[in-house]
């Protein structure tokens, strides 16, 4: 089966999901990102790799880190960035998603960065562009529903590689609302592709999706058992905006049962790192002493995210 993200030469055409993305492509993105990290320390934080290219940011859901870092990444590559104000666009007047895409493509767009509440929306856009003879326009998925958040997954892998050097001897725990988390899905696919021998999912039964075991994940409903001797902890927030029904008694009860405290962190290896994709809810999934502690690498994740998104866009642009 053809991978819709790759061209006939196996090169990245779009970035829609980490699922099915070959290990070689992931490593290429991480290695390329390494060459971009130091740009942030320069007096002039720009390289001309996408000069003359137009990048349209289409965020149909709210975002702080992802939208901002994509904009910074585009500008550091010298691209022209257009941020579409969705609430003030014609989509709020009933224009279909694909009609919006056609009109923006007619403005000579080179790349669309898309966040959408509906799973599969970026794939639909990429397929439409191919079907209408516009396959030269690239699509980057910046998060679609519960489905995928590939650049977050990639920046998480970059962060892990930066601090742990190698993937093949790690135990990684993902903790919290995994049911509604596109980040968890992207991280799991990336971790297993890169050869992590043990990936653990920790959370209440109501927030654990079916099929985790089939993905090679060990499931724990007891956080104390799940955190024992892990190398990496990835905390996830409660996605209340995606929940329907009473999946939890309260945020306070969740913290009592699944919040990452200094006492629970001590169950992991002494050099374990703590990650979080944000936004972070202190006192719900993580206590401040851990979030601000020496084992937390949450802010470096954000910094690395710029370089990783630069790498993705640069590769898509043919560099």
Curated annotation (Swiss-Prot):
Top EC class for this record: transferase
Keywords: Pyrimidine biosynthesis, Transferase
Reaction equations catalysed: carbamoyl phosphate + L-aspartate = N-carbamoyl-L-aspartate + phosphate + H(+)
Keyword Transferase: yes
Residues the entry annotates as binding L-aspartate: 93, 182, 237
Recorded GO CC terms: cytosol
Keyword set includes DNA-binding: no
GO biological process: 'de novo' pyrimidine nucleobase biosynthetic process; 'de novo' UMP biosynthetic process; amino acid metabolic process
Enzyme Commission designation: 2.1.3.2
Pfam families named among the record's database cross-references: OTCace, OTCace_N
Pathway: Pyrimidine metabolism; UMP biosynthesis via de novo pathway; (S)-dihydroorotate from bicarbonate: step 2/3
Ligand binding (carbamoyl phosphate): 65-66, 115, 149, 152, 278-279
GO molecular function: amino acid binding; aspartate carbamoyltransferase activity
Function: Catalyzes the condensation of carbamoyl phosphate and aspartate to form carbamoyl aspartate and inorganic phosphate, the committed step in the de novo pyrimidine nucleotide biosynthesis pathway.
Family of the protein in this entry: Belongs to the aspartate/ornithine carbamoyltransferase superfamily. ATCase family.
Subunit note: Heterododecamer (2C3:3R2) of six catalytic PyrB chains organized as two trimers (C3), and six regulatory PyrI chains organized as three dimers (R2).
Protein name: Aspartate carbamoyltransferase catalytic subunit
Upper classification of the organism: Bacteria, Pseudomonadati, Pseudomonadota, Betaproteobacteria, Burkholderiales
